[in-house]
């Protein structure tokens, strides 16, 4: 079946959680002139939010948080109980179906970054750095190593807490800032251990705020990312994004694989909201209703409806098109169907799927939401009750 061009392009951009780049320093040419040949230069006084001294503000910021940035080495054991060749009919014909094969183990090494947030040994990092790891080793900048225990992970926000036991020794702690008062153009300093190069620092700015997970290319996450052009490389995942004062404002997470200078960090305020739950081994509540959706405009709906091969007729309005209703979910129980267009929530007009997701998240668990939707030429009002997200990858 041939679909319209815009409909065939539904999907996220490819995203690498660790993408690498190497950098070099170029020597700049200098022009030299005799002092007598030049007129006196005017003295210009400039104001700056960061003091201009012989010491770089970046160095000062990194000296404040850098000692608390850690390297996280992981080992994951993957066990395969059967070999694919055993399912081959010809193999089974010659050797029988009960041919004994012992389980095979494969050990996969991984590496990422993190940072210590209190002197008891609590470390924040990305869930994808430690998820499924059977062994975690944490290395500090001063060379000390500790066995790490994964206390909790949350795939929906890609956050995790790892605990080390300091055994009476003092630990450096990174000061946590806030992400609520950030501005586009603020300095952004990424610290981590890319491609095995410990204690690497890169500098950039905040490119934009509130970048949705769908725009970042990872629509299964519920994060409004900080976008930065500070280089984020393999092994940077889980490391801190600092402001000019050396305070943690985000957790470096991902970049766009189809571009350069576009990286994403989880706002630190979102991490602070769930860190205690993760440290206690708890489950972070994530309400959902169970639909896969996309934004739709009048023009897109008209283009779809003119195509005789379109899978369904779409109401010609701005709204949220339901692409799929997951089985056994609140949406299915409420009677929502594929092809419906959601146009209002609790009486408030809506046309952005990211906003609907925020409304569901903020509503909490077991809360009733009234959805106004269009189905063909009919307008319906359905009530859906939120529930705990069962499988973040669905």
From Swiss-Prot:
Pfam families: PDZ_2, Trypsin_2. Keywords: Hydrolase, Periplasm, Protease, Signal. InterPro entries: HhoA_HhoB_HtrA-like, PDZ, PDZ_sf, Peptidase_S1_PA, Peptidase_S1C. GO terms for biological process: proteolysis. It comes from Synechocystis sp. (strain ATCC 27184 / PCC 6803 / Kazusa). The keyword Hydrolase applies. Transmembrane segments: none annotated. One of its GO terms (molecular function) is identical protein binding. Residues 1-24 form the signal peptide. Disulfide bonds: none annotated. Belongs to the peptidase S1C family. Induction: Slight induction by UV-B light. A putative protease, its function overlaps that of the related putative proteases HhoB and HtrA. Disruption phenotype: No effect in a single knockout, but growth is inhibited at high light (120 umol photons/m(2)/s) or at elevated temperature in a triple protease knockout mutant (hhoA, hhoB and htrA). Triple mutants are not phototactic. No effect on the PSII repair cycle, even in the triple protease knockout strain. This is Putative serine protease HhoA. One of its GO terms (cellular component) is outer membrane-bounded periplasmic space. It is found in: Periplasm. CDD domains: cpPDZ_HhoA-like. Residues 293-377 form the PDZ domain.
């Amino acid at each position: 079946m041939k679909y319209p061009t815009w409909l065939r392009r539904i999907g996220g951009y490819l995203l690498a959680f660790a993408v690498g780049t190497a950098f070099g320093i170029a020597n700049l040419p200098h022009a030299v002139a005799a002092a007598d040949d030049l007129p006196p230069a005017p003295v210009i006084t400039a104001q700056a939010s960061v003091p201009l001294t012989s010491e770089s503000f970046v160095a000062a910021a990194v000296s404040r948080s850098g000692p608390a940035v850690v390297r996280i080495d992981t080992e994951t054991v993957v066990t395969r109980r059967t070999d694919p060749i055993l399912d081959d009919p010809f193999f089974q014909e010659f050797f029988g179906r009960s041919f004994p094969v012992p389980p095979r183990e494969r050990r996969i090494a991984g590496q990422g970054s993190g940072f210590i947030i209190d002197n008891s040994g609590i470390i924040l990092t990305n869930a994808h750095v430690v998820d499924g790891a059977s062994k975690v080793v944490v290395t500090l900048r001063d060379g000390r190593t500790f066995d790490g225990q994964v206390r909790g992970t949350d795939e929906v926000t890609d956050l995790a807490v790892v605990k080390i036991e300091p055994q009476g020794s003092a630990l450096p702690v990174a000061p946590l800032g806030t992400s609520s008062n950030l501005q586009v153009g603020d300095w952004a300093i990424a610290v981590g251990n890319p491609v095995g190069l410990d204690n690497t620092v890169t500098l950039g700015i905040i490119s934009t705020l509130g970048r949705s997970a769908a725009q970042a290319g990872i629509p299964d996450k519920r994060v409004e990312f900080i976008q930065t052009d500070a280089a984020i490389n393999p092994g940077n995942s889980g490391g801190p994004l600092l402001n000019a004062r050396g305070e943690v404002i985000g957790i470096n997470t991902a970049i766009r694989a189809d571009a350069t200078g576009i990286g994403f960090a989880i706002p630190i305020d979102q991490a602070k909201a769930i860190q205690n739950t993760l440290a206690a081994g708890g489950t972070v509540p994530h309400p959902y209703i169970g639909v896969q959706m996309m934004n739709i405009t009048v023009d897109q709906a008209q283009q779809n409806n003119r195509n005789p091969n379109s899978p369904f007729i779409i109401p010609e309005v701005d709204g949220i098109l339901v692409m799929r209703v997951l089985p056994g979910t609140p949406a299915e129980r409420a009677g929502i169907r594929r092809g419906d267009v959601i146009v209002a929530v609790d009486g408030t007009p809506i046309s952005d799927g990211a906003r609907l997701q925020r409304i569901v998240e903020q509503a909490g668990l077991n809360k009733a939401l009234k959805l106004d939707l269009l189905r063909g030429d009919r307008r319906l009002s359905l009530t859906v009750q939120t529930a705990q997200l069962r499988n973040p990858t669905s």
